[in-house]
């Protein structure tokens, strides 16, 4: 009995000592390159979204495993009549500077996001709120008429223009975080900046999240626990060190000797010593080309259809692990629809002949980022379309300026990789709604919009998915996009010694849940020095 008690005592001591050491350990990661844009109203790429899970919090946060909304700055919420939402803000919710976060904080933050002069990327996701779309588009001048009110200091009142079951899922996104009043106007400064080139031009948010910025340089971003965070006692890692400028060789070496815990890059996979750490998973993301349907040469759906019929899809999609024929990655329960895959050169030529176009009308300007990858795809399309008498011009734009350039009207075909911001078809379909800030294609279809609006009120998710699949069929049927591939996420992380991190469809891993756990080594395996 004494031996058993001694063994139990030693076991408890070992766990206690590990726990004590664990609470002092820093997390070292490299998931983004360059100086990140950290204003929640203007941040756009996946690396920035991940960093903002540490610095900015809204009413809800993603569950790290299921991606379902978990109460964050709102401790509870209620819905009455399907369209009146009340969110109760936590009494101990504060920014890092100690200022309270109230219902009015969210009113000001969301109205700032909707500012019609800002054209902020995710603002249109709030169009389900009374008056939001009209205010965002400049039709409604009085922002006080938008259905976002502070009913009291702690209660945020939101009225929607339709029943929308999945509103909490949308509100997990960083764009709907609490923003400190003194930093609201800064969003306008960054609204037309695609990439921060110099540190002096960067933005440091006053944190509403689990961590705050301790140091920000061109090479690293150091985050420490926010002592004013409402849930600070459950945040286990005291400091996160993000390396912003690591070469491939540095990344490999630092990971293999244990100086980096998490890498997000695919060019190092073969050199990782412990291949258990390589996590490759399907991502709710699609690579595709889209037509600028407002362009005089591209506005005719028949001409677009001819171009699609002339595309050799096997050649265009070769080498991709998961080839895409539709816009939306096939979620569980989402109906299978007819994809874009028909190659019929004769039919394409017949359409071109019937349209009786002149030489200038048979020209397509392809705008792509400067990269060998996109140039190869553009060459395939150019060669294919030349067979039906269509000439192409390829415009190369630096990656730093590319995505902002898609707002212009100097091209006919652009490309993008889109990662769903929440695990729902609407995360993709939103980009093609008539008044969406994300709609670079300029495609407008009122039947498409009618289906989207009707789906908001549908409570049966299968019926809702059926409705949304009809909307996607409309989009594909009008030859607006050329799907290429569904993306994979690549994360190199030892999930046997790091807990709270799970592979998921949108590759978002809220930092507040990540922690070190007792390692589970593989017998005979050692870390490599090189």
Tell me what each language-model feature is.
Residues 75-125, 157, 297:
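Aromatic- and charge-enriched surface segment that lines or borders ligand/interaction sites
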Residues 218, 353-420, 461, 489:
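Ligand/substrate-recognition segments at binding pockets and active sites
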Residues 32, 234, 262-346, 369, ...:
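Local pocket/hinge segments that shape ligand/substrate recognition
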Residues 78, 121-187:
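Surface-exposed binding/hinge segments that line
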Residues 326, 393-402, 427-496, 527-530:
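Extracytoplasmic/peripheral linker and loop segments enriched in polar/acidic and small residues
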Residues 160-235, 239, 249, 346, ...:
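Gly/Pro-rich hinge or "lid" segments in bacterial periplasmic/extracellular proteins
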Residues 491-530:
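Long beta-strand-rich cores associated with HINT superfamily self-processing modules
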Residues 30-81, 111, 206-207:
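N-terminal lobe/hinge region of extracytoplasmic solute-binding protein
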């Amino acid at each position: 009995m004494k031996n058993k008690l001694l063994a139990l005592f030693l076991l408890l001591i070992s766990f206690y000592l590990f726990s004590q050491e664990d609470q002092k350990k820093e997390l070292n990661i490299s998931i983004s390159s360059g100086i990140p844009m950290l204003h929640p109203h203007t941040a756009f790429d996946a690396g920035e979204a991940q960093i903002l899970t540490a610095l900015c919090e809204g009413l809800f946060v993603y569950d790290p495993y299921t991606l379902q909304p978990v109460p964050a700055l709102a401790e509870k919420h209620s819905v009455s009549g399907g369209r009146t939402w009340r969110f109760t803000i936590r009494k101990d919710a504060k920014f890092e500077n100690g200022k309270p976060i109230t219902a009015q904080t969210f009113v000001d933050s969301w109205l700032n996001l909707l500012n019609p002069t800002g054209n902020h990327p995710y603002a249109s996701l709030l169009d389900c709120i009374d008056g939001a779309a009209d205010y965002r588009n400049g039709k409604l001048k009085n922002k006080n008429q938008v259905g976002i009110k502070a009913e009291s200091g702690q209660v945020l009142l939101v009225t929607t223009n339709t029943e929308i079951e999945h509103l909490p899922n949308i509100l997990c996104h960083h764009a709907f975080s609490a923003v400190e009043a003194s930093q609201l106007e800064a969003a306008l400064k960054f609204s037309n900046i695609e990439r921060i080139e110099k540190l002096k031009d960067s933005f440091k948010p006053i944190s509403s999240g689990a961590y705050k910025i301790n140091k920000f340089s061109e090479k690293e971003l150091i985050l420490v626990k926010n002592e004013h965070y409402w849930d600070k006692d459950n945040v286990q890692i005291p400091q996160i060190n993000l390396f912003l400028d690591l070469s491939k060789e540095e990344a490999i070496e630092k990971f293999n000797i244990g100086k980096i815990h998490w890498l997000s890059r695919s060019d190092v996979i073969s050199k990782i010593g412990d291949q258990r750490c390589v996590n490759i998973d399907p991502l709710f993301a699609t690579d595709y080309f889209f037509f600028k349907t407002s362009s005089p040469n591209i506005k005719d759906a028949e001409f677009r259809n001819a171009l699609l019929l002339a595309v050799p899809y096997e050649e265009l999609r070769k080498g991709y692990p998961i080839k895409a024929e539709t816009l939306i990655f096939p979620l569980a329960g989402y109906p299978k629809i007819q994809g874009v895959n028909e190659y019929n050169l004769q039919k394409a030529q017949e359409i071109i002949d019937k349209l009786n176009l002149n030489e200038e009308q048979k020209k397509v300007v392809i705008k792509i980022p400067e990269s060998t990858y996109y140039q190869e795809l553009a060459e395939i399309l150019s060669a294919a379309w030349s067979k039906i008498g269509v000439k192409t011009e390829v415009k190369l734009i630096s990656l730093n300026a590319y995505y902002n350039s898609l707002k212009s009207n100097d091209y006919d075909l652009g490309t993008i990789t889109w990662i769903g911001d929440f695990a729902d078809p609407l995360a993709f379909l939103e980009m093609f709604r008539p008044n969406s800030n994300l709609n670079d294609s300029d495609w407008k279809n009122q039947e498409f919009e009618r289906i989207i609006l009707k789906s908001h009120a549908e409570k049966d998710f299968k019926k809702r998915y059926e409705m949304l699949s009809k909307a996607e069929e409309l989009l594909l049927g009008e030859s607006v996009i050329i799907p290429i591939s569904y993306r994979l996420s690549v994360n190199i992380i030892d999930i046997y010694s790091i807990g709270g991190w799970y592979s998921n469809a949108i590759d978002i891993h809220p930092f507040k849940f990540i922690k070190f756990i007792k390692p589970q080594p593989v017998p005979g395996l050692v870390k490599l020095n090189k």
